[in-house]
């Protein structure tokens, strides 16, 4: 499916988004949000019946993000919640302090909160508290307002954005099958919405020289794919969905283990004679399909224009416009 990509920067800034004075942070108009709502309903229709739905706030535990390994991979993207601490005189002094020394900004101290960088990060410690993953595995629908410190004038790169994910937790076979299924279903959704796309292997923006090696390994092992859709240009399409296989990273980090046939029926009297590896359980594997809600919305307007009434019938029906 081919179409001419219109000027998305002018399109979005003039009619859909209002600049805040900070790159990548926008106020969104009613017509933009109408499409966002339609997308969320469409995504929900593709949710499996056994899926547990969780909605997370835009902040999460600093201790949890440290334990997850995020700082080792993306320290430059993390945003921390900071506040003024101390007595009334301390805080007043900071507010009225010497601007040459940084003023109140220089007096800020970190709290125990950070801005959520991806919708699935708050999920894993919750799952870990529940004990063994059942034999059938687990499915979650999670969403959050997320933040990544990537200031840019490019209209398709928000610093604060909405992410929706379906997360699969279970055995390697279960997670691989889940991702393969979604790599078939996601293009069907794009076709329904009248969007051009291509799917390619990809890597996360790991930090530093060591990060370059991590990115190479991620591509070589086909751990991440992205569905790319023209927003700014057809030559440089934008990643609007991703299909990720984390292997046992989060299982190992949070000690999430499966409860398979070998372990589920072990009686207390049989523990000593049971196979140690079976009793210990296998580390759970995880994977997710992530939807960039704001990017998908921008892609739709870039493809079909501002007037929702002129959009393809299949897209209008799918989004209930």
Tell me the role of every PLM-derived stretch:
Residues 2-321:
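TRNA-recognition modules of translation machinery and tRNA-sensing kinases, especially anticodon-binding
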């Amino acid at each position: 499916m081919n179409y001419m990509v219109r000027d998305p920067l002018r399109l979005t800034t003039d009619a859909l988004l209002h600049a805040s004075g900070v790159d990548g942070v926008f106020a969104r108009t009613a017509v933009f949000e109408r499409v966002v709502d339609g997308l969320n309903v469409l995504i929900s229709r593709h949710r499996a019946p056994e899926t547990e739905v969780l909605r997370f706030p835009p902040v999460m535990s600093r201790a949890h993000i440290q334990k997850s390994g995020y700082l080792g991979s993306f320290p430059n993207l993390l945003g921390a919640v900071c506040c003024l601490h101390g007595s009334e005189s301390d805080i007043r002094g900071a507010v009225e302090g010497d601007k040459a020394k940084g003023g109140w900004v220089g007096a800020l101290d970190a709290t125990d909160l950070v801005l959520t960088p991806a919708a699935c990060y708050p999920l894993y410690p919750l799952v870990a508290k529940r004990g063994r993953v059942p034999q059938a595995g687990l499915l979650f629908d999670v969403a959050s307002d997320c933040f990544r410190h990537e200031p840019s004038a490019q209209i398709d790169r928000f610093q604060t954005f909405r992410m929706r994910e379906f997360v699969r937790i279970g055995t390697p076979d279960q997670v691989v099958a889940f991702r393969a299924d979604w790599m078939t279903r996601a293009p069907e959704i794009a076709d329904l919405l009248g969007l051009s796309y291509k799917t390619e292997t990809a890597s996360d923006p790991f930090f530093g020289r060591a990060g370059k090696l991590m990115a190479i390994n991620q591509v070589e092992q086909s751990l991440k794919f992205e569905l790319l859709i023209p927003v700014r240009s057809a030559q440089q399409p934008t990643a609007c969905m991703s299909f990720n296989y984390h292997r046992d990273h989060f299982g190992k980090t949070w000690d999430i283990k499966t409860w398979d046939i070998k372990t589920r029926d072990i009686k207390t009297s049989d523990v000593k004679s049971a196979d140690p590896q079976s009793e210990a359980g296998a580390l759970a594997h995880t994977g997710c399909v992530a939807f960039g809600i704001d990017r998908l919305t921008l892609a739709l307007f870039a493809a079909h224009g501002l007037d929702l009434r002129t959009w393809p019938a299949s897209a209008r029906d799918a989004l209930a416009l």
